[in-house]
């Protein structure tokens, strides 16, 4: 799980601020199991390191994720 979280944060810090990714996008990028990715994303959100965005264009059951802006 820690390896997946590190990979997610590496990708998010390398892309422009505000770009959104879905769990399926993460599966394509990392090649990891979607359930492991979802657990890693949930942990990162609970740690306050990423933000979950409910997109108007996306499905309500498929949240999008982005790096949390520094305050």
What is each PLM-predicted segment?
Residues 1-5, 53-71:
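Short, cationic-aromatic polyanion-contact patches
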Residues 3-17:
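Positively charged, polyanion-binding regions of nucleic-acid-associated proteins
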Residues 17-29:
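Short acidic, hydrophobic short linear motifs in intrinsically disordered regions
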Residues 32-43:
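Short amphipathic alpha-helical interaction segments
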Residues 45-55:
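A short, conserved structural fragment
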